[in-house]
């Protein structure tokens, strides 16, 4: 049960603007929009990178994307620990500096693919990861009553923010080359990220929203699990396996969209005078954002596991359908955004469920550990998928078949394994 005094504690501590949880949520969404391009715009840089580094196999260029995801995810348990312990502002400033350096140095100083491994992969990846975990965990802390919606809105900034910028970035690449575009966008994104860092705060100790009523369809623990305690629970490993598998198909599509379009013989098509890949990627970004908000809100009402099972099954079907549309650019433009609609929800559902199952106090560190599954998925989705496609004359059909199976298995795990595990354990806490 909450009180008005509890609700006013945030205003008393931070003032009426910074202490408003909706302002906190909005600042987190803006920060996510800033870092979204580092993941979703990579496919726009690949044609220029292939031209600049013509003697380098595409799988080695795709490794830039894989390394970005790895460094975006694997350092997060440590970053999450420091965020929970020392607060969000300093870590956000560090992340902002790293993304600024990543693209700025990549555009001005990179002369080899290895240089981009360091700049785009390590620097930008680590910075984006710090900002990502900071904002998602902050949303979970500020919205215990609407975790699915808050996590979905925050993650929507990451999934859909690129919809605002992919076409402008594509135009920048066309006019400035990939180096100039990477430099100018790196500077702008770094400045905006710093501005959000100056706003973001964790809620004061003891704060709860006014008149909070726990959602009936969502089971939430009353305990606060440390990372070590969380990793002693079977449900954590089930969630990790599910996150890993469902991530694979979406990441593969995100990082290789240009090559997938070429393998489907639709790359040279245009729509309304716009090249098909940036146009489709923009629409897909919108659907990706919609997915995180809509599925997150649905999960608040109907439960996380039921929502996961439905969405993952839909994703598996859509991923399989992608293998059947060779030579059909209209089908590509229609189907691809729906792939993202059925995939983007994982970042809302798993972050919200981490707070439900293991408590909000250590949400940054706990979700940071779970989020490393995305790093493992990136190995299969980036370099791995490109290598397998090369074995089949550039076709991504086999990687997509594997991803579809992963999605269906994850849907089954959500209903038949994760749901009973969580309910049994939390019922035993009473």
Task: Describe every region a protein language model picked out.
Residues 42-49, 228-297, 381:
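Extracytoplasmic gate region of multi-pass secondary transporters
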Residues 49, 130-143, 151, 345-358:
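Intracellular juxtamembrane helix-capping segments at the cytosolic ends
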Residues 49-50, 82-83, 164, 168-176, ...:
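Interfacial helix-cap and linker-helix signal at transmembrane-aqueous boundaries
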Residues 66-81, 282-294:
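Central cavity-lining transmembrane alpha-helices of secondary-active solute carriers
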Residues 97-111, 314-327:
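C-terminal ends and interior cores of transmembrane alpha-helices
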Residues 102, 114-129, 244, 331-345:
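Hydrophobic core of transmembrane alpha-helices in multi-pass small-molecule transporters
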Residues 158-205:
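Helix-loop-helix hairpin linking two adjacent transmembrane segments in secondary transporters
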Residues 252, 275-353:
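C-terminal transmembrane helical hairpin of 12-TM major facilitator-type secondary transporters
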